[in-house]
Amino acid sequence: MTSAVFPGTFDPPTNGHLNVIERGSRLFDKLDVVVAYNPKKSYLFSPEERLKMLSELTKNYENVSVHL
């Protein structure tokens, strides 16, 4: 089983992020998308909002999980 981690702030998630997630879901058996937080950076959305957005955008990919 192959797996990969795709970390990022995803503030907000973009089409480029989704493209990487789509390609990663085809290349790996399991893809973990990790919503990162940097206290030195200002954000448009909270980590929970970004998690919710990414979860909704990736819900059709059975092998993709989104985490904080």
Question: What positions do the PLM features span?
Answer:
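Nucleotidyltransferase catalytic core that binds NTPs
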Residues: 1-68
